[in-house]
């Protein structure tokens, strides 16, 4: 229901703003821009996202099936089970969904978006199997989605690569700020959903895992900043991500071989579902992308940024960060739009400027909430999303606020 009202609001708000621009400012091109944008968004949803996703989904669902036959998913479920059983109490012990979620979070941590999406869709399908109300998002599905939308990433590889292309003196200088901001977003999302679902986080297992993850991140930050040069950080990030991913593939294959599984047939069996899954999500994907495009092309976001700037000026708050806000505002709506805005900001202000760096941290501090909701819930036919969107946006907001503070600390 929330998604229904939100979708309607995007169109109505865009229409009202466009009408004001036409009547009071003589902008005769605004409605053409919006209508052209609807066709472009629909095309992008199918040709640039859904169809390429067919190949990726086919590959990784095949690999995942090999992993399941090899027992790797159950192995991961047993390791992470004690922690996940506390924050996902609805998921039975050693259920495959646990392993699928671990694979998704791991791919996100490594910044491997192409692998994370198939893992995430598989996890959502596994959670749907134990969902008693197939039209309504379960507590476990909401927790998973909010943690996913917080976008916890250790290695923002694509952002560092874009900074290098634009000639940044130190492309990796946003590495630690991105890690801190996205970690804050994840923790806030976890706590908020746990409170809503009455999950006790003051548990020795939960505290131990969260403490261990925090120490691991702190150790990584210390090691990267004290023992590696800027160039080495980029090389290690790039090599480690792809090495770990390919190692997982080989481990799945060897594990299946050890169990005398016909590996190729297992791959084909899993890969068959790739096309079906992508066809299922196309209507949800196109509907959300068109609504987002309408809102963006109407100029609503620009007016919101101007309003924030006016408020901050009158409150006596430093407004050096406001030119980077469009990236933060577009990120929950569109990953490609946020990337384009980040690049445009760096081109306008310079990749080594405060605003340029902050736009990069914004881009790495959270994920595309509305896209993920449409994609993941659409893949399993969820129509009632309950509180998934507001809590996902809360995690995004926490990441944005953290990004501002961290950027002032590191770059201002």
Please identify what each model-predicted range represents.
Residues 41, 77, 85, 106, ...:
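Generic serine detector
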Residues 115-116, 123-164, 168-199, 325-412:
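C-terminal transmembrane helix pair
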Residues 29-129, 259-348:
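Membrane-embedded alpha-helical segments and adjacent helix-loop junctions characteristic
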């Amino acid at each position: 229901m929330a998604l229904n009202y939100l979708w309607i609001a995007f169109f109505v708000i865009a229409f009202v703003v466009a009408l004001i621009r036409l009547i009071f400012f003589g902008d005769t091109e605004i409605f053409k821009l919006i209508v052209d944008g609807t066709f472009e968004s629909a095309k992008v949803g199918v040709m640039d996202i859904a169809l390429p996703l067919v190949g990726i989904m086919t590959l990784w669902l095949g690999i995942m099936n090999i992993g399941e036959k090899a027992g790797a998913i159950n192995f991961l479920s047993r390791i992470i089970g004690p922690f996940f059983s506390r924050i996902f109490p609805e998921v039975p012990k050693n259920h495959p969904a646990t392993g699928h979620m671990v694979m998704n979070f791991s791919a996100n941590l490594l910044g491997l978006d192409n692998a994370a999406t198939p893992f995430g869709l598989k996890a959502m399908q596994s959670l749907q199997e134990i969902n008693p109300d197939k039209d309504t998002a379960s507590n476990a599905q909401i927790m998973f989605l909010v943690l996913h939308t917080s976008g916890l990433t250790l290695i923002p590889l694509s952002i560092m690569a874009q900074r290098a292309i634009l000639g940044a003196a130190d492309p990796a200088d946003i590495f630690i700020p991105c890690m801190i901001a996205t970690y804050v977003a994840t923790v806030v999302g976890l706590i908020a959903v746990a409170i809503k679902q009455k999950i006790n986080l003051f548990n020795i297992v939960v505290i131990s895992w969260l403490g261990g993850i925090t120490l691991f991140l702190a150790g990584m930050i210390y090691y990267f900043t004290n023992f590696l040069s800027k160039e080495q950080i980029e090389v290690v990030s790039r090599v480690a991500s792809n090495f770990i991913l390919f190692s997982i593939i080989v481990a799945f294959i060897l594990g299946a071989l050890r169990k005398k599984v016909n590996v190729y047939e297992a791959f084909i069996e899993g890969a068959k579902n790739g096309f079906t899954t992508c066809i299922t999500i196309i209507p949800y994907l196109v509907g959300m992308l068109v609504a987002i495009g309408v809102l963006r092309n109407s100029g609503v976001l620009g007016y919101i940024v101007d309003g924030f700037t006016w408020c901050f000026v009158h409150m006596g708050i430093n407004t050096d960060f406001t030119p980077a806000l469009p990236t933060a505002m577009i990120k929950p709506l569109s990953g490609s739009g946020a990337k384009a805005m980040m690049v445009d900001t760096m081109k306008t202000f310079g990749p080594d400027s405060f605003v340029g760096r902050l736009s990069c941290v914004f881009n790495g501090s959270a994920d595309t909430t509305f896209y993920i909701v449409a994609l993941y819930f659409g893949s399993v036919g969820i129509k009632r999303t309950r509180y998934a969107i507001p809590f996902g946006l809360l995690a995004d907001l926490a990441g944005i606020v953290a990004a501002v503070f961290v950027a002032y600390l590191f770059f201002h």
